[in-house]
Amino acid sequence: MKRLLPLFAMLLLLGSARAATPLPGDSVYNLPVQLTDQDGRQQTLAERRGRPQLVTMFYTSCQMVCPMIIDSLRLTRNALDPATRAQIDLLAVSFDPARDDVATLKSYAQKRKLDPRIWTLARTEPAQVRQLSGVLGLQYRQLPDGEFNHSSELILLDADGRIAARTARIGKLDPEFVEAIRKLVAQPRG
């Protein structure tokens, strides 16, 4: 046991050194965004650092484009080999925090059969929705009837939260986007 103690200490230091490394200036994770997921768990956006992410924005009461966005995210993930798939996290943040509370997100995830070990559906405060959408380059506006007019894109973030690729191809697979994911995951981290 005494021999293992230095090894544990070294591993702990390596892990904390990664967390202490400053974020790149163009990292989405620099935003002070607090997320609450479909299970009521809270985390900052920066806490997602360390693994590549497929990110999008949507809202649960959307009947047209948002289901296609979620299906496109699923289709993209399923096009990856199992080893690559295991290294990618999925994050969908709501444009509509007023209506998309935790219970609504959970119900949507269950209805769409989105495995919570793979999918994070999240909400944040309205001002943070605006900040996040701006940094991701997604535009939206609420219409008088309560619906939203919004961009429809999937975005690949690297492990440090930098935008590595994006696609606006919704409803069918974008092979170039899938290849960008494969290349990113294959890169050595360091």
Regions found by a protein language model. Give the residues of each.
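Thiol-/selenol-based redox modules, centered on thioredoxin-like
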Residues: 143-190
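A short beta-strand-turn-helix
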Residues: 33-53
